């Protein structure tokens, strides 16, 4: 890297991860040399279906309503992003635009110019590298052009949170760009929302666990993880061997996935997941509330974001009265049935934005009943993969 890029990277790292204390802290574990990124030996356990081979109603009945993860193929075939989101093209078109790669200790975004980030991505040897996880591109006058390059798959277009308004709704869409070893720590997506993640280039390794899996089984302890306990790669180093051991409880058996370019992962609300990039990756991901999962999302939003829920309900009464009637029928005194991560129900996670997310209902009472947070503090945990 040239001096200007090197200076930009050092400044960004100091803001985003001051606890790592310089270059040695970022490479101390030597994962660039000793972590196996090959995936040919991994048994992928998630089925694939072509998006044109199933109707919307069938998708709801087979996957969304029973909350079963699945990989969709063919959904991105017509996207302009397939051509426009090559790293060289992004580096040229958005070279001087700043994208979020983390947060500082006060919860404010740490950003980096695309031209510097792409150079960093190509040359870095960090254990858990900086990761573009930008959720504000849609509101930026120049970066918003990225919205023209893709559209949500048809199964996910009826997003009820849109009625809360773009400025009021929780962060919900992210462009994610990262090198090998970057990723997201173990988490549950915010407010009971489901998510889709479409991969443009590269390969991602996922592990997913059912909602009832106890959080303490999935966490990397601070003692084990040290300064990297919230990072995806550290999870695979410390927890993955336990998951694959004969003593792992069968009732918490995981799903293991290798996501390839052109594949879209559907993550139902409540599923724990951790993601590791195996090479240079570019993806887009969105969280959503649909008529199918609305009863859970409403329950968690009322308890976790009461002011937002009031504004949302007023809009639903006008534009979607049939959904507003469902809201009136939700018993807020009963538990929702989906686990919550203590930091996630005002949000979720990335290696560049600390795990925005125990066991099912015991933790829900704390996560879903947190009061309205200040916007600056919410930003720190409002990112997901």
Swiss-Prot record:
Residues 340-357 have a biased composition (Low complexity). Disulfide bonds: none annotated. Residues 141-305 form the JmjC domain. The keyword Membrane does not apply. GO terms for molecular function: histone H4R3 demethylase activity; metal ion binding; P-TEFb complex binding; peptidyl-lysine 5-dioxygenase activity. GO terms for cellular component: cytoplasm; nucleus. InterPro entries: JmjC_dom (IPR003347), JMJD6_ArgDemeth/LysHydrox (IPR050910). The keyword Transcription regulation applies. One of its GO terms (biological process) is peptidyl-lysine hydroxylation to 5-hydroxy-L-lysine. Its EC number is 1.14.11.-. Its cofactor is Fe(2+). 2-oxoglutarate binds at residues 197, 285. Residues 337-385 are annotated as: Disordered. Transmembrane segments: none annotated. Keywords: Chromatin regulator, Dioxygenase, Iron, Metal-binding, Nucleus, Oxidoreductase, Transcription, Transcription regulation. Substrate binds at residues 184, 204. A motif (Nuclear localization signal) lies at residues 377-380. It comes from the Eukaryota. Fe cation binds at residues 187, 189, 273. Belongs to the JMJD6 family. This is Bifunctional arginine demethylase and lysyl-hydroxylase PSR. The gene is PSR.
